[in-house]
Amino acid sequence: MKCPKCSSTHSRVVDSRHADDANAIRRRRECENCGTRFTTFEHIEVSPLIVVKKDGTREQFLREKILNGLVRSCEKRPVRYQQLEDITNKVEWQLRDSGQTEISSRDIGEHVMNLLMHVDQVSYVRFASVYKEFKDVDQLLASMQGILNDNKRSDL
């Protein structure tokens, strides 16, 4: 690291601590040339995920879009914001763990729906109705029937 005062590249680490919920390391350094102390942060570098949309366009993955969609789906429902954060985090890490750099928006939606189903079924239907673009009530009812069938199987 270059010293911010004299630009020397010779420094020693005086102190190291976890920062940002252990996603980074904060280091206090001292320049061996001029004695100036300064702080550096070390973060894990993750490669960007690219979302391939339905129309074939590509854009950078933004976790905020998932979170915003979940918040809208869960309005006036007994779902805590932390649960939505947890779903968003799980989806992001599932995508990153897949090893792919390009992910279809369809795959992202499926990951979200699979996790949301276990949190709140009404919110799941709301999310699915936007994600799956139901054209009529029959499609909505078919989705709800799938939930009922899953519930009956899990009760057995």
From Swiss-Prot:
The keyword Cytoplasm does not apply. The gene is nrdR. The keyword 4Fe-4S does not apply. InterPro entries: ATP-cone_dom, NrdR-like_N, RNR_NrdR-like. Pfam families: ATP-cone, Zn_ribbon_NrdR. Negatively regulates transcription of bacterial ribonucleotide reductase nrd genes and operons by binding to NrdR-boxes. Keywords: ATP-binding, DNA-binding, Metal-binding, Nucleotide-binding, Repressor, Transcription, Transcription regulation, Zinc, Zinc-finger. PANTHER family: TRANSCRIPTIONAL REPRESSOR NRDR (PTHR30455:SF2). Binds 1 zinc ion. A zinc finger (unnamed) spans 3-34. GO terms for biological process: negative regulation of DNA-templated transcription. PROSITE patterns: ATP_CONE. GO terms for molecular function: ATP binding; DNA binding; zinc ion binding. It comes from Staphylococcus haemolyticus (strain JCSC1435). Coiled coil: none annotated. This is Transcriptional repressor NrdR. Its cofactor is Zn(2+). Residues 49-139 form the ATP-cone domain.
